[in-house]
């Protein structure tokens, strides 16, 4: 089995690094396409041994599982470009925020009657095999197709199937979640520095506190509130700190952040469905198209079947 990424940005780089680190795929069975070959992420993929090309069509031809790892407003253009090259063997996995299964299927059905589409939302901690991924299968995807993606994504963290109508909310929760954690960690470190702790040590201790708290929660059946209470002694420093957080609306800020991300995801969905693109984004898209028309620079390995993950496209049953 081979995996392709349309787009060679942060997500593609994180997934490729995670898959190779987990041992489920060797780098030569991964291909990524990008109109720009001087990006830091492209350099990182090259160092891993991943095949690189400027041609999205090459990526489709040399892959079985195809990740659409580009911005939502680019998806319609990409599907128009590669639709004729998508075959029955392909599992098309959309990772773009807000882009629905039906919108991808509608585009691809102009080229073939039963495209296998899966919508996926993951996050950047896949790079250290601690990602959080959910997926929903499309009309024509087989049960085995979903299980194959789940097996692949479970190698880089937690993965589970959900109904598609939950994915926008999950984008705001775990998709954007690492950014909330990094901002919180940055602020915790600032607090430590303010009180005299060296920056490097403050960052390390703050990160370890978040890591340890997450592990305690995942390894127990206790409610987060109970674990929080266990840290607070009567009249102690922690309860005074929590009072300060509560008075500043800490909980409401996090709730509102998840809501804001979810709402924006739905706005992106509407823009993608209507193929609305901002002038700046349109200019970049046109420039990328010009680059794609230039001679292809690629280092391609022939598609081959992997030993760890296999599937037979002739078998399986469609989801009801």
From Swiss-Prot:
Keywords associated with the record: Acetylation, Amino-acid biosynthesis, Cytoplasm, Mitochondrion, NADP, Oxidoreductase, Phosphoprotein, Proline biosynthesis
Chloroplast found in the keyword field: no
Catalytic activity: L-proline + NADP(+) = (S)-1-pyrroline-5-carboxylate + NADPH + 2 H(+); L-proline + NAD(+) = (S)-1-pyrroline-5-carboxylate + NADH + 2 H(+)
TM regions (residue ranges): none
Enzyme class: oxidoreductase
A GO CC annotation given for this chain: mitochondrion
Pfam families per record: F420_oxidored (PF03807), P5CR_dimer (PF14748)
HAMAP family linked to this entry: P5C_reductase
Subcellular location: Cytoplasm; Mitochondrion
Family: Belongs to the pyrroline-5-carboxylate reductase family.
Source organism phylogeny: Eukaryota, Metazoa, Chordata, Craniata, Vertebrata
Cited function: Oxidoreductase that catalyzes the last step in proline biosynthesis, which corresponds to the reduction of pyrroline-5-carboxylate to L-proline using NAD(P)H. At physiologic concentrations, has higher specific activity in the presence of NADH. Involved in cellular response to oxidative stress. In some cell types, such as erythrocytes, its primary function may be the generation of NADP(+).
Quaternary structure annotation from Swiss-Prot or TrEMBL: Homodecamer; composed of 5 homodimers. Interacts with LTO1.
MF GO annotations: pyrroline-5-carboxylate reductase activity
Residues carrying Phosphoserine: 304
Positions of NADPH binding: 8, 10-11, 34, 36, 56, 70-71, 97, 230
PROSITE patterns cross-referenced by the UniProt entry: P5CR (PS00521)
GN (gene name): Pycr2
Record's protein name: Pyrroline-5-carboxylate reductase 2
UniProt entry tagged with the keyword Magnesium: no
Matches recorded under SUPFAM superfamilies: 6-phosphogluconate dehydrogenase C-terminal domain-like, NAD(P)-binding Rossmann-fold domains
Pathway: Amino-acid biosynthesis; L-proline biosynthesis; L-proline from L-glutamate 5-semialdehyde: step 1/1
Single GO biological process annotation from the record: L-proline biosynthetic process
